[in-house]
């Protein structure tokens, strides 16, 4: 897949949701919430500042991130679902 987000946008693949309860019961799609954690797949060149300079993004490809429940725009590419969002919609980078 070749996608290059513009400016301060990033492409995120959601982490797989847990489909099995602690007791071993399979949870249907309709009963699970979409995860708010994902992996950065692609990043733009950076945020264009008021003075015209470009600030590089703090996140990079491969980072595991947390984002808001309603962040980003869902897109489907090559049969897979991704989110395109601005860097400011990312709340944290998960390390370790």
Swiss-Prot record:
GO-annotated cellular components: cytoplasm
Q: Does the keyword Cytoplasm apply?
A: yes
Q: Where is the protein situated, by its record's location annotation?
A: Cytoplasm
Q: Does the record carry Chaperone as a key word?
A: yes
Read off the SUPFAM superfamilies from this record. GroES-like
**Main function:** Together with the chaperonin GroEL, plays an essential role in assisting protein folding. The GroEL-GroES system forms a nano-cage that allows encapsulation of the non-native substrate proteins and provides a physical environment optimized to promote and accelerate protein folding. GroES binds to the apical surface of the GroEL ring, thereby capping the opening of the GroEL channel.
* Protein name as annotated: Co-chaperonin GroES
Species for this entry: Allochromatium vinosum
């Amino acid at each position: 897949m070749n996608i290059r987000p513009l400016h301060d946008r990033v492409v995120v693949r959601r982490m797989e949701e847990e489909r099995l309860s602690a007791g071993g019961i399979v949870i249907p799609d309709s009963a699970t919430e979409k995860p708010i954690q994902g992996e950065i797949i692609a990043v733009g060149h950076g945020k264009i500042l008021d003075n015209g300079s470009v600030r590089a993004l703090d996140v990079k490809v491969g980072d595991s991130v947390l984002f808001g429940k309603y962040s980003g725009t869902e897109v489907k590419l090559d049969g897979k679902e991704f989110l395109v969002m601005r860097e400011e919609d990312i709340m944290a980078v998960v390390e370790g």
